[in-house]
Amino acid sequence: MSGHSKWATIKRKKAATDQKRGNLFTKLVKEITISAKMGGGDPSGNPRLRLAVDTARANSMPMDNIQRAIKKGTGELDGATYDEITYEGYGPAGIALIIETATDNRNRTVADIRHIMSRNNGSLGESGSVSWMFQRKGSLDVPKSAMQEDALMELLLDAGLEDLDGDDEVYYTVVTDIRDLENAKKALDEAGIAYENAKVDLIPENYIELEADDAEKVIRLIDALENNDDVQVVYTNMEISEKAMDSLNG
C-alpha cells in the first residue's frame, strides 16, 4: 500500500457502502444510446457500445432496457437526442475537475453545473483549463486474489499493458492505451481471469493530496454533480491519505 487513495479507489469504497443506486441506469442508457448512434448497433463492431453494454449487464440492467437503448441510438425507436459536452473547472483546495455530460438541453445543463459548482466552493473554467493535466487511457480492475502481480504483468505485457497500479487493497488497476483495452480484456478472458470496471478513463498525470476536511468538501461537490441526470462521469486529480480516508469513513 502507498498510504494514499486515488479517486478510483475512493469511488469504489463509496459505492460499496452507498445505499443509493441513484440515476445509474439513466446514465447507462444515455451511454448506450450515444454509442449506438455514433458507431452502429452491433457491439461486436463497436468497442464503445460493447463496453457500455458490458457495464450495463454488470450492473444488472435488464436486456430489454439495453436493446431499447440501442434501438433509440440507431433510430429504430424514437428517443431524445443527446449532445456530449465536457466541462472543466476547479473544486475546493484547487483540485481539477473534468465533468462529462450527455444532455438534450445545453442551457439547462450548464446552468445546473454552474449552480452546483458555486454552491460547493467550485468554479467552472475555460475549455482546456485542466484537461492538459489528464491522459485518456483504457483501464480495468483485476482482483488481487485472482493472481500474483508478476504473473499478471507477464500476461498483459504483450497485450498493451502500460501501467499496473497495486495501491488498492483489493484490486490491481490495469492501464493501457485506449486502442489496447480490448487486447487486455481478450488476454484476461483467454486466461480465465475475472476483471471489472473496464472503461475508457481520464487519468491524472499528477495527484493533489488532500486531508479530511478538504476531501470531504470535494466529495460533497462530486456527489452533487453525479446526482445530476445530465452528468455522466466526473474525473479529478484528488488523492487522500489513508489516515484522512479512515477519518472520513469513521
Curated annotation (Swiss-Prot):
The keyword Nucleotide-binding does not apply. One of its GO terms (biological process) is regulation of DNA-templated transcription. Gene3D superfamilies: 1.10.10.200, 3.30.70.980. One of its GO terms (cellular component) is cytosol. GO terms for molecular function: DNA binding. It comes from the Bacteria. Pfam families: TACO1_YebC_N, Transcrip_reg. Keywords: Cytoplasm, DNA-binding, Transcription, Transcription regulation. It is found in: Cytoplasm. Its main location: cytoplasm. InterPro entries: Integrase-like_N, TACO1_YebC-like_2nd/3rd_dom, TACO1_YebC_N, Transcrip_reg_TACO1-like, Transcrip_reg_TACO1-like_dom3, YebC-like. Belongs to the TACO1 family. PANTHER family: TRANSCRIPTIONAL REGULATORY PROTEIN YEBC-RELATED, TRANSLATIONAL ACTIVATOR OF CYTOCHROME C OXIDASE 1. This is Probable transcriptional regulatory protein Clim_0475.
